[in-house]
Regions:
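Conserved class I S-adenosyl-L-methionine
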Residues: 54-64
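Conserved SAM-binding loop of SAM-dependent methyltransferases across substrates and taxa
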Residues: 65-78
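Conserved SAM-binding loop
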Residues: 94-95
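Conserved SAM-binding strand-loop segment of SAM-dependent methyltransferases
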Residues: 102-117
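A short acidic, Gly/Pro-enriched loop at the edge of an enzyme's catalytic core
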Residues: 118-128
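A short glycine-rich, Lys/Arg-flanked "PGG" loop and its adjoining helix->strand segment in the class I
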Residues: 143-157
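SAM-dependent methyltransferase
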Residues: 162-235
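C-terminal lobe and adjacent flexible extensions of AdoMet/dcAdoMet transferase-like proteins
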Residues: 223-287
């Protein structure tokens, strides 16, 4: 599928500034990738199963534009959130577009912090979320273990660290693209640029293709180590977590696509592409 979407067609040039040059990459990312309400519902279900009460304080690590942190504060009047990210650009965008969009009372319950998630200290949280495979940026075991240890210290008693994980044979290929429409004449393009099986390291990119033929190329790029579920659970145990459990996404019958339904599982079948959520807790589960 390479070369299918030219960056700017002649027709787009004739009409003036191409749509790709006018678009906001963060707005497109949130529209195509993030589902804060879904994430909140899933984390709430998992936390309540372990603690018998709703979680109130969320820390969103690697928060980017803090869509989850802001949605969290907006979901209940007694909820607070911290969003932590090293990059000032998405934080500034999130402050303008997500934080400012909250009612004044809710804005007081959200704090956005620029800093390294391994060193920023916040009040102990009921939940720490590291979503969108953000912790895959740590490519060495010691680095990732250090992050898990710091997260463990930032959790309240009974707190949970919630991670999402991506894998399967389809993620271990090169020159592969997935295209889907996200509305407004825009197509989301996920490209797998490179995969190194010796280091289990992969390079991905998100592009956005527009109806005028223009392309926002490399809107976001990711250089990740593709951590496996057993590796992550071992590192969580080494970091001091009392337990971890896996919530596996069911596949749709017939298509094999993700259904959005996550169930706690001990085993799973070989799927070409899968997503899962790992929840790690500070104390052994009651069940």
């Amino acid at each position: 599928m390479r070369g299918r979407h030219p960056q700017v067609t002649r027709a787009a040039r004739r009409r003036g500034r191409p749509l790709a040059a006018q678009a906001d990459r963060y707005a497109l990312y949130q529209k195509s990738v993030q589902s804060p309400d879904f994430d909140i519902a899933l984390m709430n279900r998992i936390y309540r199963a372990h603690n018998g009460r709703p979680p109130l304080l969320l820390r969103e690590d690697f928060c980017g534009a803090a869509a989850l942190a802001c949605a969290w504060a907006g979901s209940r009047r007694d909820r607070r959130a911290y969003g932590i990210d090293l990059d000032p650009e998405p934080l500034a965008w999130g402050a303008l577009h997500n934080w400012q969009g909250l009612p004044e009372e809710a804005r007081r319950r959200v704090q956005l912090v620029q800093g390294d998630v391994r060193t920023v200290r916040t009040p102990r949280a009921d939940l720490i979320a590291a979503h969108n495979f953000s912790f895959f940026i740590f490519r060495e075991r010691d680095q990732l273990r250090d992050y898990f240890r710091s997260a463990r210290r930032q959790l309240a008693e009974g707190g949970l660290l919630v991670l999402d994980v991506l894998g399967g044979s389809d993620t271990q290929t090169e020159d592969r693209e997935e295209v889907r429409r996200i509305g407004g004449g825009v197509r989301y393009v996920w490209e797998q640029k490179r995969y190194d099986p010796i280091n289990n390291r992969a390079l991905f990119a998100i592009h956005f293709a527009f109806k005028d033929g223009s392309l926002m190329k490399d809107a976001f790029t990711y250089d990740w180590r593709m951590w496996t579920v057993p590796e992550l659970r071992e590192l969580l145990a080494e970091a001091g977590f009392a337990f971890s459990e896996v919530y596996w996404e069911d596949a749709e019958a017939g298509t094999g696509e993700g259904s959005g339904v996550f169930r706690r599982r001990e085993r799973a079948g070989a799927e070409a592409c899968w997503m899962a959520v790992i929840a790690a807790g500070t104390r052994p589960p009651a069940r």
